[in-house]
């Protein structure tokens, strides 16, 4: 018998499968929270995924909800989400049945008031300032007259037109525009790439390297200018090797790139004015400097002329300057004749001293000595030949004796010895003949020198040698006294003579004058 309590009664509660229940919850949640606005702090943000979607969470002090921003929505955001930023997200809540999770799909995102953004900017500013990126010592002066200006901005806005127009009015230079987006997704990356790209240009390349950079954007809200507060952009501006001018927004708009730039311009037009000077002002200044230089040069020339006149008046006259040199010249000219006479006398005395060493008896003795040397050499040569002949005869005798013992073996040696003796004899005769020729040549040369230095050659030219009674040559007129017996030697003989008084000579027949054009036979002693 079955108990009443053991039987199962049907329940009034509907039964669902897990999928049905999850789908019902999903529909209920999406219908109830189809459009919501949620305030919270971004947590776990790591930037967009490789697919372009962004995943993070919104949290407050007691709860947390996952959030997703699809790729198309992320591209339309006015600013990039950042970790710790308080935002207001607008979207719809949905669930994910596979893991029983719910999340908000964000359609728009905005900062939760300007105060939150300013607090984030201040926190980032303190961090970068602590690293020294905003130090005044890092900032470089702008070039006075750049040749190339690089501009990083949007190519379609009014900003680039204002910059180009202002540069053309002030000082036309070469402007290179690097087109970028200045707002929205990817704007920060493009501006950073432009700054780094300009710095990567090499001087002298196909694209000229700018001398100064301008990063410019027009005015806008804090959200519109948010990319210029990006940490990567601030670091790129601080690391730029090219001086950089920031011109973001209006004069009251300040971004972090303004603190890292070398100069901050209140407007893009002001940046163009900072980059290039006014050409007309430079020309006027140059003309003023040229006029001042011309006046200074004229005054300097006048001063120099006055100084030159004063110095000229203080200088002595030309006659005074030349008086002493003229006197020295006259004295030198007067002493020139005396100097020539003294020099001639000195040369004559030197000649007489040297002539004394060329006496005939010395040359004769030298020739005799050379002849004796030649005879000695001839005798030595004859003895040498005689000894060689004797030694050859001895060798022949020895060879003859040996030949008797060994005729067949020594016949060749005898012939060779005989040839060697003959060769030695010929060589000895040739050597003796060569020595005799050389000695005869030297003796002939000495004889020619003796003949040239002999006084007979002088007598041959028409001169006479005067000797006293002892036969000694008379060298000076002072050694001759009246009545002194003299001997006059000519080239063809000698005659006796007596010296007259006071140097007068006995009368001689008048010599017939030489015919005109007939050369005289009288030679010159010198």
UniProtKB/Swiss-Prot annotation:
The keyword Nuclease applies. Pfam families: Exonuc_VII_L, tRNA_anti_2. The keyword Secreted does not apply. InterPro entries: Exonuc_VII_L (IPR003753), Exonuc_VII_lsu_C (IPR020579), OB-fold_nuc-bd_dom (IPR025824). Its EC number is 3.1.11.6. Its main location: cytoplasm. It comes from the Bacteria. Transmembrane segments: none annotated. Keywords: Cytoplasm, Exonuclease, Hydrolase, Nuclease. Residues 499-526 are annotated as: Disordered. It catalyses: Exonucleolytic cleavage in either 5'- to 3'- or 3'- to 5'-direction to yield nucleoside 5'-phosphates. GO terms for cellular component: cytoplasm; exodeoxyribonuclease VII complex. GO terms for molecular function: exodeoxyribonuclease VII activity; nucleic acid binding. It is found in: Cytoplasm. GO terms for biological process: DNA catabolic process. Belongs to the XseA family. Bidirectionally degrades single-stranded DNA into large acid-insoluble oligonucleotides, which are then degraded further into small acid-soluble oligonucleotides. Heterooligomer composed of large and small subunits. This is Exodeoxyribonuclease 7 large subunit. It comes from Rhizobium meliloti (strain 1021) (Ensifer meliloti).
